[in-house]
Amino acid sequence: MSKKLVAYFSASGVTAKVAETLAEAIGADIFEIEPKVPYTEVDLNWMDKKARSTIEMNDPASRPEIAVKRDNMKDYDTIFVGFPIWWYVAPSIINTFLESYDLTGKTIIPFATSGGSDIGKTNERLAPSCKGAKLLDGKVFKHSVGHKELAAWVDGLKL
C-alpha cells in the first residue's frame, strides 16, 4: 500500500473541510499549504484588478512563497493536491508547492472546490510544475461532499 498525502491550500476554509474529509476517508496524512504572507479579504477580491490574487493569477511566473515546507515529502508515493478554483485554474501557490519538491515517480492528483467553475485548464497549468511525476486528471467537489463520495472517487482512480 502506498503512502498518501493530502496537501491543500484553502482561502476560505471550504477546501480545508474537503481536504480533511478526504484524508479521513482514505487514511492519508494531511498538510496545509500556507502562504508566507496570508491572504486578506482585500487580496482575494477577484473583481479588483489590483488585488493580490488578481495580480498573481495574471502573471504566469508568479510563485507566492510558502510559509513551511513538508519535511518528509520523499516518504509519499501519492499526493492529492487541493485548492479553490481561481480563474478556472489552481492558484499559483500550488505551482510553488509542487516546484518545491522532487516529485519524480510520484502520482499527483488535483482536487478542487468551486461554487460553479469546473476544473478548466488546471492540469495544463500544473503539468510543468510536476516534472517526473504522473499527473492524473483532477476533479471539482462541492463543499458538502462526504466520505463516501470521496472514497468512491479515490477507489475509481485505481491507484
Language-model region placement:
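Glycine-rich, N-terminal phosphate-binding loop of Rossmann-like dinucleotide-binding domains
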Residues: 83-84
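N-terminal beta1-alpha1-beta2 submodule of the flavodoxin-like/Rossmannoid cofactor-binding fold
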Residues: 1-78, 88-90, 95-99, 148-159
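Short, conserved loop/helix-junction motifs that constitute active-site signature segments
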Residues: 73, 99-105, 129-130
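Short, glycine-/small-residue-rich phosphate/pyrophosphate-handling segment
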Residues: 109-145
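A structural micro-motif
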Residues: 26-28, 106, 133-134
